């Protein structure tokens, strides 16, 4: 489940900005 504060693509949270989850995740940093 993605929350708006989970704006990272790490193994623990698996979320990205815009509440888009791991499938569409692009790791930028």
From Swiss-Prot:
Tissue specificity: Expressed by the venom gland.
Compartment(s) of residence: Secreted
Keyword field contains Disulfide bond: yes
Function: Potent and specific blocker of Kv4.2/KCND2 (IC(50)=5 nM) and Kv4.3/KCND3 (IC(50)=28 nM) potassium channels. Acts by altering the gating properties of these channels. Also shows moderate inhibition on human voltage-gated sodium channel Nav1.7/SCN9A activation (IC(50)=423 nM).
Something else known: Negative results: does not inhibit Kv1/KCNA, Kv2/KCNB, Kv3/KCNC, and Kv11/KCNH channels. It weakly blocks the neuronal TTX-sensitive sodium currents of neuroblastoma cells (13% inhibition at 100 nM). Does not inhibit sodium channel Nav1.2/SCN2A.
Domain notes: The presence of a 'disulfide through disulfide knot' structurally defines this protein as a knottin.
Family: Belongs to the neurotoxin 30 (phrixotoxin) family.
Name by which UniProt lists this protein: Kappa-theraphotoxin-Ps1a
UniProt lineage: Eukaryota, Metazoa, Ecdysozoa, Arthropoda, Chelicerata
């Amino acid at each position: 489940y993605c929350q708006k504060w989970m704006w990272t693509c790490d193994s623990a949270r698996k979320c990205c900005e815009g509440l888009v989850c791991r499938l569409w995740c692009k790791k930028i940093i």
